């Protein structure tokens, strides 16, 4: 593991919401083929044997360093067997009832199929369900991007993009996860869905750290940031082609904060996956270090409160009180509002 831990000593117990993590019990209730069957070849972080074991709420709580209080979290679908999207949502809802985590769940649905609407509506029975992470077909490298242009399941596929309309109709959000060479394409696709709430995963996945690759990443991030309904998670800067370096990744975090502004950045760990490269404390401290570099002293604490806590409340409409009480920071005090309703 490559890890450099930056030490942050808060003057008080800092409330924290982790806006992206995964749970799995591997006990037969929900199947995870990538964890329980043959390992996936070319996993983007390399050998992942260390996470092929249960990771549940108690494990996440133990990772939070002294000086911080984990007051909520957002669970993101964890590549469960695709026939078990509803089972995963139900299992996560049971975990919250027992362990008080997570505060919200981002599920999955089969975009581009006749079953998508029903899958969304069934999951809306859970008071935790806020939206889905459905991944479009993407190219494996920047050089091969044209190989998927216009193909079924891609961002140019009108049938697949009907899923985005279904989310909008149901007031659900979309967790967007594509590598950097598809960011501008995603920004273009979203122009047809101006009311859709979107949360970009993992800093836009700047896997290609060449000058050309980073230039394309910046262009894509700026294109998405031009849409006021897009936020970004400060999470997962591991790359399949470059070593994990704290200093370089800290610079990328600063760029994300500059492009999107602190109001649209959410702290997120992507644990346990990110734990293959960095400790929880190390990642949290790296995010805080970037915030401190990008913020004047008089605004530092309020900015920390936004990125580490309040922004997750706003973007995922969590039933948790905010800290900064800015007009733009709101929360839904009635989480059952997101329970199943008849589709319009």
Feature map (PLM): residue ranges:
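A general structural detector for well-ordered alpha-helical segments in enzyme core domains, enriched
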Residues: 59-64, 88-95, 116-123, 159-166, ...
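Catalytic pocket-lining loop regions of alpha/beta-barrel enzymes
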Residues: 150-266
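Acidic-and-aromatic substrate-binding clefts and catalytic sites of carbohydrate-active enzymes
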Residues: 51, 79-86, 109-117, 178-184, ...
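Conserved, mostly hydrophobic/aromatic
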Residues: 20, 73, 105, 132, ...
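Active-site gating loops and adjacent loop-to-helix segments of metal-dependent hydrolytic enzymes
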Residues: 25-72, 127-153, 196-197, 228-231, ...
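Histidine-centered catalytic micro-motifs
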Residues: 16-26, 200-203
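Active-site gating/metal-coordination segments in enzymes
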Residues: 4, 83-181, 188, 233-238
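Mid-to-C-terminal alpha-helical segments outside catalytic/metal-binding sites
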Residues: 2-19, 28-63, 255, 259-266, ...
């Amino acid at each position: 593991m490559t890890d450099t831990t930056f030490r942050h000593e808060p003057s008080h117990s800092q409330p924290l919401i982790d806006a992206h993590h995964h749970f799995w019990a591997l006990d037969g209730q929900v199947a995870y083929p990538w964890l329980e069957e043959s390992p996936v070849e070319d996993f983007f972080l390399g050998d992942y044997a260390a996470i092929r074991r249960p990771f549940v709420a108690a494990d996440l709580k133990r990772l939070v360093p002294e000086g911080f209080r984990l007051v909520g979290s957002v669970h993101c679908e964890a590549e469960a067997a695709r026939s078990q999207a509803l089972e995963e949502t139900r299992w996560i809802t049971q975990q919250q009832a027992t362990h008080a985590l997570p505060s919200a769940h981002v599920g999955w649905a089969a975009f581009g199929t006749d079953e998508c609407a029903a899958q969304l509506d069934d999951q809306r029975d859970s008071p935790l369900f806020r939206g889905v992470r459905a991944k479009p077909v993407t190219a494996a490298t920047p050089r091969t991007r044209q190989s998927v242009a216009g193909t079924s399941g891609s961002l140019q596929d009108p049938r697949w993009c009907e899923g985005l309309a279904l989310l909008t109709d149901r007031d659900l959000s979309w967790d967007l996860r594509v590598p950097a060479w598809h960011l501008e394409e995603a920004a273009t696709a979203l122009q047809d869905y101006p009311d859709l709430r979107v949360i970009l995963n993992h800093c836009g996945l700047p896997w290609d750290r060449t000058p050309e690759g980073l230039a394309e990443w910046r262009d894509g991030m700026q294109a998405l940031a031009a849409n006021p309904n897009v936020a970004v998670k400060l999470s997962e800067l591991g790359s399949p082609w470059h070593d994990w370096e704290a200093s370089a990744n800290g610079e990328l975090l600063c760029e994300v904060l500059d492009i999107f502004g602190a109001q649209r950045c959410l702290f997120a760990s992507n644990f346990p996956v990110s734990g293959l490269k960095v400790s929880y404390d190390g990642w949290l401290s790296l995010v805080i270090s970037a915030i401190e570099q990008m913020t004047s002293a008089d605004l530092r604490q309020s900015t920390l409160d936004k990125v580490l806590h309040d922004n997750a409340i706003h973007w995922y409409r969590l039933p948790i009180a905010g800290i900064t009480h800015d007009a733009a920071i709101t929360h839904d005090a009635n989480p059952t509002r997101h329970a199943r309703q008849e589709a319009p």
